[in-house]
Amino acid sequence: AQELLEQIKLEKQKLIKEGKLKKSALSDSVIFKGDDNKYYEQIGKKCLDITEQIPFEIPVNWAWARMGQIGDWGAGSTPQRGNANYYNGNILWLKTGELNNGIIYDTEEKITQKAFQDCSLRMNKIGDVLIAMYGATIGKLAIVGEDLTTNQACCGCTPYLIYNWYLFYFLMASRDSFIKKGEGGAQPNISRVKLVEHLIPLPPLKEQHRIVAQIEKLFEQLR
C-alpha cells in the first residue's frame, strides 16, 4: 500500500503539471509505525505521535493515510433561488436528500451553464463518491452515475488510483464516527476539513477489489 501512496503522489504531480490540481495538494503526510510500536505522522520536518488516533491495527502490507491524500474533495453550492437564469437548464444539480447510498443517474433539479459559471460549482464526474455533510442526512452516500453538481451540504471526492467502491464502503462503515465528529452545533456538521483529515486504512489495490467483492456478496445474501 505504501507503493500505492507513491503512485498517488506521482499521479498528483502529473495533475498539477496539467493544471488540474493546486500545488498544495502535494503537501501530504506520511504515517508509519516506529520501532517502539507507536504510530507517527511525518508532515514536512515535523514528526508527531498519532498513536491515540489510530483506531485499529492493520496488516503489514496496508498503510494508514488521511482521506485528503487519496482523492480531490470539494463541496458544491446553491445558485440564488430568485434568479430565473440559474434554473431549468440541463446540468444535473443534486441536493443531499437525494443521496441514495447507491448510484445517482438523475436529479430533481437542473441548473444552467450560467449558474455553473457564476456560482463556483464543482462538476463531479462519473465514478466520484458523494457524502452528505450536514443535518439528518449526514454520512449518506452515492456514486456519481452521470456528471453532476451538488449543493453546499454535499462533498464530492474524485479518488486518485484507489477503488471508488472501497472508499464508498469505508465511508458507509464510518458513518457513526462522522455523526460523532459532527456533534456540538445546532445540527451535525462534518465539514470538508474534517473529512480530509479522517484516517483511512489503505490496502493494496487488488485487495480493495477483493474486499468490495466480499462485501457485495454478503449484501446479496442479506437481500
Predicted regions and their residues:
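Extended, domain-scale alpha-helical bundle/helix-rich regions
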Residues: 1-47
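Non-catalytic DNA-recognition/assembly elements of restriction-modification systems
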Residues: 3-6, 10, 14-15, 48-77, ...
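Sequence-specific dsDNA recognition surfaces
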Residues: 45-53, 68-83, 97-126, 144-145, ...
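Short amphipathic alpha-helical segments
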Residues: 52-54, 153-155, 194-198
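A short beta-sheet element
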Residues: 95-96, 106-172, 184, 191
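Specificity-determining recognition surfaces
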Residues: 173-198
